[in-house]
């Protein structure tokens, strides 16, 4: 809904950067999820597993467990995002070998080495999808004098997002408001521009990977 609501409606993010930003709204959101998976009254409340960034504090973890139980879960368990990502792609996390996981989420990115069923080393930092979107917004405004919203920035990222030059350039047409006169305007933007826009952020991720591998 970001970028698509009228001016009299506010879009709220219950979770931000991987942790609870609004406790009450988070509780309502989880309660709604539980009703969808368990609509009939009288059935036992479900057990819930929630992913959290590897770098969150014990206080932040406790808040997630508490809000999930208050929302109606019988039991709440946490799993660190890199571990969930490893399981999701089919890795045998119990093998006596190291697996490097890079999980670029919305608010945070997670880099972890996993072996023998545990996380050996990890780094959690706030350079991820949301930062990509705001960086694209700033780039388009500065280079093209065009004002776009988060919805358009995400569309650009998904359709032509790249971190290195492609063999064949990809371009799309986007709409926005002229920053000089406020009038609607369309422009063509290409993947090479996104490579330029995201270069610094990508380099930050690369540096974090180097630290983990040292």
Describe the function of each predicted region.
Residues 1-104, 112-214:
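Nucleotide/phosphate-binding catalytic cleft detector across ATP-hydrolyzing
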Residues 107:
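Conserved Rossmann-like nucleotide-cofactor binding loop
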